[in-house]
Amino acid sequence: MSRVFVTGGTGVIGSALVTRLLERGDDVVGLARSDSAAETLEARGVRVVRGEGYDEDDLTRGMEGCAQAYNVAGVNALCVDDPRPMERMNVGGAVAAVRAAARAGVARLVHTSSAATIGEPPGTVGTELTPHRGWYLSTYERTKTEGERAALATSREVGQDLVLVNPSSVQGPGRAGGTGRILLAVLDGRLRFFVPTCVSLVDIDDCVAGHLLAAERGVAGERYLLTGMTLAIGDALALAAEVAGVQRKPRLLPRRVATVAAAVVERGFKIAGRRPPVCREMVRTLLHGHRYDGSRAERDLGLRYTDPRETIRKTVDWARAEGLIR
C-alpha cells in the first residue's frame, strides 16, 4: 500500500479517482478547503489536510510522505466577470503543486490539465503536438493553458517529475454541470434550442484510468489527451435520446442568431447586476467546437476507451436514479 495525495477529491474527476485509489488499497490523503469537503472525504476513509489548492505550504504538508500526487483541483466556469479566482487556482495552483511536490519529495506528480489547452484552429483535429492557435476562446482556456505551461517550466526549474493529462468533456455518473448539464436539459425537454457544433467526450472511468496509467507509464514532461469520441452535436443528442427512450431533437440556431442573442442576454443581465446564463464567451466556445485525437493515450499508456453508447447509458441511469431527468 502506498500513500497518495489528491487535490479536488470532491469534484467529478477527483471523487472518481479517490474511489479507484481506495479500491486498490492506497492510503489516500486529500486536500480540503471547507468543512463540507473535509467531512465528505473523511467519511470515505481519506486522510484530510486542510488548506487551499494554490498555497504551496498547504500542499507540501499534504504531500509529505506520499509517493505520488494528483493535482486535480481547478476552476471551470464561463461568463465570469472577475478572472482572478480562476487565475489563482488554474495558474497559481499548478505552479504551487509542482513546487510542493519537489519540496515533499514526491516521485511523480500528475497534473490534470484540459484538452482546451491544445488550442486547435477552427475545424481541425487537435493532438498533443498541435501548435496553439495563438488566441483564446475563454478565460478558462487561457488560465488552463497558462497553468500547464507554468507547471512544465517550474518542473524543469525544480527538477520535479511531472506528467500532464488533458481530458476532453468528461461524461458519466456525477457529471451534472458543463456539457453534462446540457445533455440532461435536452433529455428532460428543458432545452429546445442549441448551436451547431462538435464535441469530444471521455467516459469518467476512462478519464480516471488515464490518470492512473499516466502515473504508471507516462513520460515526464509529456501530456496525454484523454478523449474517446468526437461527435457532431446532432448525433450526440440523437444517441442520448435513443438510449434514454425519449423523443428529443433541439432546433439548431444559425451561428449569427446565437451570437447576437448571447450578446443581448449578457448585456441585459449585467445591467441588472446578475450573472448571465448565456454569454458571448460561452457561445464562442460552443460554435468553435472541439475535435481531439486521444489515440496517444491508447498507444503509449494502454488506455482503452468505452463505447459512447455505454457512457451515455451510465449517465442516463444515474441521472434518473438521482431524479435529474424523468
Kindly give the residue locations of the regions a language model identified.
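A hydrophobic C-terminal alpha-helical subdomain
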Residues: 191-195, 199, 206, 255-300, ...
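N-terminal Rossmann NAD(P)H-binding glycine-rich loop of SDR-like oxidoreductase domains
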Residues: 4-24
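NAD(P)H-binding glycine-rich loop region in Rossmannoid oxidoreductase-like domains
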Residues: 36-42, 46-92, 100
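Active-site Tyr-X1-5-Lys
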Residues: 137-163
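NAD(P)-dependent short-chain dehydrogenase/reductase
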Residues: 158-201
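Substrate-positioning beta->alpha
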Residues: 96, 178, 195-215, 221-222
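Mid/C-terminal beta-alpha module of Rossmann-like enzyme folds, strongest
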Residues: 210-277, 294, 308-326
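Conserved Rossmann-fold NAD(P)-dependent oxidoreductase catalytic core, especially the SDR/UDP-sugar
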Residues: 89-140
